[in-house]
């Protein structure tokens, strides 16, 4: 009987492993397909050139798609775990959800951590160096020569990073950075390096998310139809039509030899056509879309932002009085044992919405920063080098999202796998400072956003607008140059 029980246990374990592997593969396949279509939408079509370059581009495209799929998996990791916990609580003995268990969720967290490290330290550097390589001088040109150069560059990069990490660990803890620890690469240096990358990602989120939370109002205002209050859309369309006709007459009147003026006028005409299309869309929009959807979305964004700041403020108070509020505190109950939200399923749904909202805001804020403005992908006009840079940036942001959500107290779900082993998560001063900075920066960005119009009028009244003390050009409506060269805002 004991032998049969042992065989039965081994068979059950084998079937569980096969089932979990199949589920993980199917989930990743879906994410990979979606990521592939996203990259193809932005990839420049002219990148497909010679046979050798075409092979290099295809390999780089495969690696970039893999990285973007891993990023999407890291974003979905925490929401999937939260909703799985609530489903297991609601249906603990349901036959159709036996595949959903703690082992599967732990496996997903471990795979996300493993693939994030693999993409960040191996695949993306390989894709970049492989794309830029030409082969060493004296060797026969071809794929093998480019692969050899790429591997040499990767080896040199690995030695450089290993040396920097060893020096950094020596400055922090001289005992940990002994010569014997050089042999402990997997257990010490790689987790330490990923912990540093995670901290950098959280700091980048700290910079991008408050900016994105304020920019979300502008972005949604550009996507939705605004109410036409005290505006005559027919007159504006008539004016923009006259401007379009004037530009077309000027364009046809110029000789083809004046290439610079022709290109400038074509770009100006394209901008005018885009503005005309937006005005016609506003005119054709229904009264419900104009007068209800836009205010409702703005109020919803304001509520979500306010709830986020309120949760961070409550988390700051919890950190001051309760040490279990630390992200690296005591482990709570297992998955499916107890609800981690005070309001049950409704609270879990709110946490998931806020996590996605913070991720979207961080991406919007990332591309809104002037330093990363050139990284913004354009449809059918993004080079593979820029795609690789965008994939790395999204990977860093998405990998740090679960850590940031737990650090800010957006959710109480414990970080699983390597995500919960970062050393800095146990530092009270770092965690408290992170929460304080997030709350202060978000509040200041929102105040700056909603008082920009008042500041502009005040600067104009005082005659200070010529000094460019207020930078609201990114949030205001874009002014279009008219046919006579003067600026005209519609």
Curated annotation (Swiss-Prot):
Residues 1-19, 84-110, 173-187, 313-339, 405-426 are extracellular. GO terms for biological process: embryonic digit morphogenesis; embryonic hindlimb morphogenesis. Putative membrane receptor. PANTHER family: LIMB REGION 1 PROTEIN HOMOLOG, LIPOCALIN-1 INTERACTING MEMBRANE RECEPTOR LIMR. Residues 256-287 form a coiled coil. It comes from Mus musculus (Mouse). The keyword Transferase does not apply. Belongs to the LIMR family. Pfam families: LMBR1. The keyword Ligase does not apply. Its main location: membrane. It is a multi-pass membrane protein. The chain crosses the membrane at residues 20-40, 63-83, 111-131, 152-172, 188-208, 292-312, 340-360, 384-404, 427-447. It comes from the Eukaryota. GO terms for cellular component: membrane. It is found in: Membrane. Residues 41-62, 132-151, 209-291, 361-383, 448-490 are cytoplasmic. InterPro entries: LIMR, LMBR1-like_membr_prot. This is Limb region 1 protein. Keywords: Coiled coil, Membrane, Receptor, Transmembrane, Transmembrane helix.
């Amino acid at each position: 009987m004991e032998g049969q029980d042992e065989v039965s246990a081994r068979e059950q374990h084998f079937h569980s492993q096969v089932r979990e592997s199949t589920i993980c593969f199917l989930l990743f396949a879906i994410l990979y397909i979606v990521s592939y279509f996203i990259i193809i939408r932005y990839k420049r079509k002219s990148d497909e050139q010679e046979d050798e370059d075409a092979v290099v581009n295809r390999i780089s495209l495969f690696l970039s798609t893999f990285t973007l799929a891993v990023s999407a998996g890291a974003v979905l990791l925490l929401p999937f775990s939260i909703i799985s916990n609530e489903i297991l609580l609601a249906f603990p003995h349901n036959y159709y959800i036996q595949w959903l268990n703690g082992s599967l969720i732990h496996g997903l967290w471990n795979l996300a951590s493993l693939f994030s490290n693999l993409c960040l330290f191996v695949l993306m550097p390989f894709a970049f160096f492989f794309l830029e390589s030409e082969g060493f001088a004296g060797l026969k040109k071809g794929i093998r020569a480019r692969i050899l150069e790429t591997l040499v560059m990767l080896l040199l990069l690995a030695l450089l990073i290993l040396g920097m990490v060893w020096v950094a660990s020596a400055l922090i803890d001289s005992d940990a950075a002994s010569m014997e620890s050089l042999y402990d690469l997997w257990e010490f240096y790689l987790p330490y390096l990923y912990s540093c990358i995670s901290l950098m990602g959280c700091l980048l989120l700290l910079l991008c998310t408050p900016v994105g939370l304020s920019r979300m109002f502008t972005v949604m205002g550009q996507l939705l139809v605004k109410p036409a209050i005290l505006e005559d859309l027919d007159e504006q369309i008539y004016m923009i039509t006259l401007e379009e006709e004037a530009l077309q007459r000027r364009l046809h009147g110029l000789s083809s030899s004046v290439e610079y003026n022709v290109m400038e006028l074509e770009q100006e005409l394209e901008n005018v056509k885009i503005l005309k299309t937006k005005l016609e869309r506003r005119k054709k929009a229904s009264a419900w879309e104009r007068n209800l959807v836009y205010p409702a979305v703005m109020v919803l964004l304001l509520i979500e932002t306010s709830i986020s700041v309120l949760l961070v403020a409550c988390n700051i108070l919890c950190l001051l009085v309760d040490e279990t509020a630390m992200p690296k505190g005591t482990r709570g109950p297992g998955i499916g044992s107890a609800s981690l939200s005070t309001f049950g399923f409704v609270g879990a749904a709110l946490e998931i919405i806020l996590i996605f909202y913070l991720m979207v805001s961080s991406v919007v804020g990332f591309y809104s920063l002037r330093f990363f403005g050139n990284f913004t992908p354009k449809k059918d006009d993004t080079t593979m080098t820029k795609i690789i840079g965008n994939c790395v940036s999204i990977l860093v942001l998405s990998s740090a999202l679960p850590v940031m959500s737990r650090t800010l107290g957006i959710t109480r779900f414990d970080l699983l796998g390597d995500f919960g082993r970062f050393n800095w998560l146990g530092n009270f001063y770092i965690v408290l400072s992170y929460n304080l900075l997030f709350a202060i920066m978000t509040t200041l960005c929102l105040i700056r956003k909603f008082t920009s119009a008042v500041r502009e009028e005040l600067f104009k009244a005082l005659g200070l607008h010529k000094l460019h003390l207020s930078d609201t050009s990114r949030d205001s409506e874009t002014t279009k140059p008219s046919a006579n060269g003067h600026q005209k805002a519609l």
